[in-house]
């Protein structure tokens, strides 16, 4: 006869707080700072979908309609940029072009600084 095995109890579970805390930082450019990178602004103005897919690809996310709030929130929390989901919602719904261009400019600058 075999002895009954004891169930395994998980005491700590990995989750959101298990990784290193992001460093606090700010956006590299302002929301309406279009002239700091005219190429990004022109791309967003004339081919918004292309820019949205490019940003999603940069973040290793899928390019689906309606994910802009989630991507902005993910990006902001990943880099410790202050704000809230409510802020992200308002920015992406009131000015989706400015929001998307700001994320792309930020990605480009962080890449140039090798912090992306």
UniProtKB/Swiss-Prot annotation:
Some GO term, biological process aspect, for this entry: which one? positive regulation of transcription by RNA polymerase II
- Please give one Pfam family short name: PLAC8
The cross-references to InterPro entries, in alphabetical order and at most eight, read:
PLAC_motif_containing
Protein family (similarity comment): Belongs to the cornifelin family.
The protein here is known as Placenta-specific gene 8 protein
